[in-house]
């Protein structure tokens, strides 16, 4: 696995790093987030904060999930520091799953 790309978001005080085995258009990629100055553990411990899954249309995905009763703590819309369309859903244990629209 290798670092494919990395980007700092000074306005949001976080860095995103994307790792994988090949080109992002044809291979699975893991997005790692480093929140600058995070001193306290996250709500559910310090193992991880959330997973992200790429989907073709975040808005339509959220509509389908909401109609199935899935909790959506952050509705679909553009990311404040980057412009990608994202949303967050919660699993039954309270872990967040980010939905990010694939380009």
Where is each model-derived feature located?
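Generic signature of intrinsically disordered, low-complexity segments enriched in small/polar residues
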Residues: 12, 17, 21-24, 45, ...
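Vicinal oxygen chelate
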Residues: 35-96, 103
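Core segments of cupin and vicinal oxygen chelate
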Residues: 1-27, 67, 80
């Amino acid at each position: 696995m290798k670092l494919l790309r990395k980007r700092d978001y000074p306005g949001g005080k976080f860095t995103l790093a994307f790792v994988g085995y090949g080109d992002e258009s044809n291979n699975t990629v893991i997005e790692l987030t480093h929140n600058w100055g995070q001193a306290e553990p996250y709500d559910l411990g310090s193992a991880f904060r959330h997973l992200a899954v790429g989907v073709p249309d975040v808005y339509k995905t959220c509509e389908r999930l909401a109609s199935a009763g899935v909790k959506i703590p952050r509705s679909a819309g553009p990311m404040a520091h980057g412009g990608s369309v994202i949303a967050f859903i919660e699993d039954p244990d309270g872990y967040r799953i980010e939905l990010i629209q694939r380009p």
